[in-house]
Amino acid sequence: MSKKILRYTGTFAAVLGLFWTLLILTSLIPNGQIKKNLQKSEEFYKSAEAFSFEQGQKMHTVSDNYADAILLNILWNIDSKQPVLTSLDTKYCDGGDYGVNWGLHQALNGKKANCDYSRYWHGSVIFLRPLLLITDVQGIKNIGLAAVLLLAVCNLLLLLKKKQYFVAVSVAISLLCVHIWDVRLSLEYLPAFLVSLTMCLLFLGLEKKGDDTLMMLSVVSGVSIAFFDFLTSETLAILLPLILVVLVRWQDGRLGTFPENIRWLVRCVCCWGISYVMTFLVKWTAASVATGENKFHSAIQSAGVRFAGTSQEENLPLFKQIPYAVFANISTLFGGEGRVDFGKILIGLLIVLLIFGGGYYLLHGKEKQKDVTRTVLVLGAVPYLRYLILNNHSYLHEFFTYRAQAVTIIALCAVVWCNRESQLFRGKTQSSKAKSSKMQGTKNASAKKKGGRR
C-alpha cells in the first residue's frame, strides 16, 4: 500500500513539475514579441460585450469575453524577467468602472495590474503565449477547436479499431448534444475538452493493464484539469474516460458486478479528487511563499462563494438557487433562451423520455443487465451532484458547466443498448432458426428417400 501511495505521489509531483516548468519556459517569451497579436485581440474585445450571444438568445452560444479578457491580461502581466514569481503571483488590470475589456487595453498601455487572480494556475498560458507569436485570439480559438475535433476523431477511430461501435456512436451523440463546436466561442471553454479527450485516449489505450493503472491515470487527469481548466466542466476529465472504460469492459465481457465496479470507480475518483485539490493547494502555497502574502484567504473565500454564495444580480435565495442550478444546466442543454427556460426543459425531457424510454421499452429483454446499468447511471448522475454542491457557480455559469452532461447522455444511451433484446430481433432470430430447422428437416427427409430407393 505504501509503495502505491509513493508511486501516486511521485506521479503527481512529476506531472505538476512538468507543467510548471513549461509555464515558466513559455513565460520567457518577451512580451514585445506577442504585443502585436495581443493588440489585435484587444481590438476585438474592446467592442465586445462581457457575455455575448452568438445565436439569438440561446444560452449555449454565450461567448465568455469577460474571462478571455482576464486571461489575456494575466498573460501580459507575466514578466519574462521574473518568470517564476509572475507565473505564481498572477494578476490583471480590472479596468475599474469600465470593466476588464478596458483593463486589457490599459495593461497593454503600461498600467500596472491591480487585481489578484492567483487562485488558478492559468495553465493555458503554456499554449497561448507561443501561439500569440503567430496569430491573434480568433486564430487561437480556431486552432483550439481543430485540436478538440482532432482528439474526438482519434477517440472514435480508436473505439472503432477496438470494434466498440456502440461506444463510438454514443460518444459522437453526446458531443453533438453538448454543442462541441461552440467551444470555439471562448478560450476558457477549450482546456476541459482538450484534457478530457486526451485522457480518454490514455484510459482506453491502457485500461487492460489493470485498475492500478487507471488510478495512476486518474492522478494525471486531476492534476491536468486543475492546472489548465477555469472550473468549467472539470468532471468530464474523469467521468468521460471512466464511463468509456466501463462500456468497453462490458462489451468485452470483462466488467465485474456492480459492487466491484463501484469499488474501483470510487478509488479512481478519489485519486482524481485528491490530486485536483492538491494541485490548487500547491499553487496557493507556492504563491504565498513567493510573495510573502497569504494567498489562501482570497482563494478559500472565492471557493466559499461558489459553494454557498447567492446571485446578487438576480436576488435569488439559496434554497431556490440550489435546485435552479440543476434546472439551468438542463435548460441550456435543450437550447434554453434564458437562464432557466422551463418550456425548453419540459419539451427536452419529453423528447428524452420518448427516445430513451421508448427505446428501452421496445428493445429491452427479459434478462436485465443490472450491473452495467447501475454503474453507468451512477456515473451519469455525478454532474448533477456537482451542480448541487457548487450551486452558485453552476447557476451563474451554466452556459459552460452544462457540457458536463455529455456523460449523462452516454449513460442513457448505454441503458438502452446494454439491455436490448427486442421482440422484433428475437422474432427474426426464432424465425431464422425455424426456417433453418425446416430446411434441415427437408434435407434429411430427402436423404432418407434417396437412401430408401437404393
Put a short name on every predicted segment.
Residues T26, I262-L353:
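Membrane-lumen/periplasm interface segments of specific transmembrane helices
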Residues I126-G144:
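Juxtamembrane segments of multi-pass membrane glycosylation machinery
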Residues L145-V169:
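Transmembrane-helix motifs of polytopic, lipid-linked glycan transferases
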Residues V178-W181, A226, G380-F400:
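Transmembrane-helix signature of polytopic, lipid-linked glycan biosynthesis machinery
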Residues L396-C418:
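Hydrophobic/aromatic-rich transmembrane helices and adjacent perimembrane loops
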